[in-house]
């Protein structure tokens, strides 16, 4: 008997066993009830729908599924990407959070940007500052802190100078074409 014929018999036996256990004793909690098929339906219905394996409706978020095709995943990913770019481009008084809450500026309807698809958005943005502002606004809309995105002035140049000195010392080593010959002279650990 091959595995395709064994599976329905096994499911039927499990269903019958569950029926007998329920008749002998009351249910022992949610673990038994959630792992077994519904006792009111026929075994054939349970084998076809397998409702006990599917995601419970009360836990399901809108638009989410457990079993989803690759094409559907791609479509949803493109849809989410479009929604993100639309929300990042949505006019707000202070997309970068640079003004205090009470001092946000209003945008006029003539200056509001019209949402465009992501590929066209990259082509139409010629100004690098506009690109940077767009990326910063998008990152902030995703919850990245403003302090992380906008660099602070250096408190001390000592660290920067020490790093530059270190790079200057090792520059001849890395620029030298005989790097392999130099490494062969070093003792191996």
Swiss-Prot record:
Protein name from the UniProt record: Testis-expressed protein 22
Region Disordered: start-end pairs: 1-120
UniProt superkingdom: Eukaryota
Comp. bias intervals (Basic and acidic residues): 70-87
Record's subcellular location: Cytoplasm; Cytoplasmic vesicle, Secretory vesicle, Acrosome
Ranges of compositional bias, category Low complexity: 14-24, 103-114
A single cellular component GO annotation: acrosomal vesicle
UniProt source species: Mus musculus (Mouse)
Entry keyword set: Cytoplasm, Cytoplasmic vesicle
Primary localization: cytoplasm
Record carries keyword Disulfide bond: no
């Amino acid at each position: 008997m091959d595995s395709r014929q064994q599976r329905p018999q096994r499911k039927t036996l499990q269903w019958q066993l569950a029926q007998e256990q329920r008749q002998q004793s009351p249910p022992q909690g949610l673990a038994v009830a959630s792992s077994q098929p519904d006792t009111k339906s026929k075994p054939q219905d349970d084998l076809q729908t397998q409702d006990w394996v599917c995601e419970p409706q009360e836990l399901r978020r809108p638009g989410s599924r457990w079993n989803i095709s690759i094409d559907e995943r791609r479509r949803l990913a493109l849809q989410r990407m479009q929604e993100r770019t639309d929300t990042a481009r949505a006019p707000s008084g202070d997309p970068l959070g640079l003004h205090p809450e009470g001092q946000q500026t209003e945008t006029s309807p003539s200056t509001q940007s019209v949402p465009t698809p992501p590929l066209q958005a990259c082509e139409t943005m010629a100004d690098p500052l506009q690109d940077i502002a767009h990326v910063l606004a998008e990152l902030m809309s995703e919850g990245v802190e403003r302090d992380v995105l906008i660099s602070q002035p250096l408190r001390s140049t000592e660290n920067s100078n020490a790093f530059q000195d270190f790079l200057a010392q090792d520059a001849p080593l890395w620029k030298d074409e005989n790097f392999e010959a130099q490494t062969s002279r070093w003792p191996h650990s």
